[in-house]
Swiss-Prot record:
Signal peptide: none annotated. This is L-lactate dehydrogenase. One of its GO terms (biological process) is aerobic respiration. The gene is lldD. Keywords: Cell inner membrane, Cell membrane, Flavoprotein, FMN, Membrane, Oxidoreductase. The active site is at H275 (proton acceptor). FMN binds at residues 106, 127, 155, 251, 306-330. It is found in: Cell inner membrane. It comes from Serratia proteamaculans (strain 568).
Length: 380
């Protein structure tokens, strides 16, 4: 398959992965309206083309939380990344470090903190869920700190798991799921060998380290699902803020009032996000939620965004809407599934090139030059 654009990796991933894994990363909640709107609404943002601006010294470099980035892109937390490629978290982290951007390890990664952190030459970020088992949360934070993690991404939009109907159809869950997954693996021999056999252990590395015994996909669906905490409130985050001395980012904000609460709480950053359309169907797309949040808190807190970003052009659009940087999820997972570390590295180069073309044609020499003035007003 020819990969000429960042968006080509989705089809390549579908050809490579067993259906239960492809549809797990590709799917969303309920009827997936928000999932579709994330990309559709972002694609509808019209950029304002400018000409004859002398764009010879263009730069994508930026700084977030005291860390220099080659471009305003972070590889965001994606659960079970190690099931898309052999030891997938390590491969993705290496590609990110090679490009000069951060990688964020998910709570529910296959590879544990202690395997990923030493594999790269820059501090990774770590994502943590709010769970009933506070002992696990403290253990994960202590281990992340010991591994040199400086930046914590705290996901707050998952007090309960989203209803992802596609998972039951694909074999990730539902009747006879284990048998269906095994049959799918047999019909995808390249994945079965490279990941299924050579990529073991297939457990939740961070959870296994805490529980002292191996975990499985059933634990991901079972133990983790019963551990999400619907009672969480801002006061429950106080001990984490006290414990974690580095930058703390609150991920999963869609409303300006919640963004203001994050500022009052003392968060260093927020991620405007609907969890990639995987939690509550029918909520605003990130592209439509971001401008009001930026108007409410821009300058008081670092603004990041995710959900629906598939290309360098999308990165430029999100920054014009008010973000200081973006997190990639599905986009890099597709590339990882298709071609491992090399696929992610190529994806990041494609995004770099796409950003440079877009910035040249809107007259923005630096990331700071991208603003609401870069958009055609009335078509946002």
């Amino acid at each position: 398959m020819i990969i000429s654009a960042s968006t080509d990796y989705r089809a390549a991933a579908q050809a490579k992965l067993p259906p239960f894994l492809f549809h797990y990363i590709d799917g969303g909640a309920y009827a997936e309206h928000t999932l579709r709107r994330n990309t559709e609404d972002l694609a509808g943002i019209a950029l304002r083309q400018r000409i004859l601006r002398n764009m010879s010294d263009l730069s994508l470099e930026t700084s977030l939380f005291g860390e220099k980035l080659a471009m305003p892109v972070i590889l965001g937390p994606v659960g079970l990344t190690g099931m898309y490629a052999r030891r997938g978290e390590v491969q993705a982290a290496k590609a990110a470090a090679q490009k000069g951007i951060p990688f964020t390890l998910s709570t529910v990664s296959v590879c544990p903190i202690e395997e990923v952190a030493p594999a790269i030459d820059r501090p990774m970020w770590f994502q943590l869920y709010v769970l009933k088992d506070r002992g696990f949360m403290r253990n994960a934070l202590e281990r992340a700190k010991a591994a040199g993690v400086k930046t914590l991404v705290f996901t707050v939009d998952m007090p309960v798991p989203g209803a992802r109907y596609r998972d039951a159809h694909s074999g990730m869950s539902g009747p006879n799921a284990a048998v269906r997954r095994m049959l799918q693996a047999v019909t995808h021999p390249q994945w079965a060998w490279d990941v299924g056999l050579c990529g073991k252990p297939h457990d939740l590395g961070n959870v296994s380290a805490y529980r002292g015994k191996p975990t499985s996909l059933e634990d991901y669906i079972g133990w983790l699902g019963t551990n999400f905490d619907p009672s969480i409130s801002w006061k429950d985050l106080d001990w984490i803020r006290e414990f974690w001395q580095g930058p703390m980012i609150i991920k999963g904000i869609l409303d300006p009032e919640d963004a203001k609460d994050a500022v009052r709480f003392g968060a260093d950053g927020i991620v405007v996000s609907n969890h990639g359309g995987r939690q509550l169907d029918g909520v605003l797309s990130t592209a439509h939620a971001l401008p009001a949040i930026a108007e409410a808190v821009k300058g008081d807190i670092t603004l990041l965004a995710d959900s629906g970003i598939r290309s360098g052009l999308d990165v430029v659009r999100m920054i014009a809407l008010g973000a200081d940087g973006v997190l990639l999820g599905r986009a890099f997972a597709y590339a990882l599934a298709a071609a491992g570390q090399a696929g992610v590295a190529n994806l990041l180069e494609l995004i770099d090139k796409e950003m440079r073309v877009a910035m040249t044609l809107i007259g923005a020499k630096t990331i700071a030059d991208i603003s609401a003035d870069s958009l055609v007003q009335g078509l946002r």
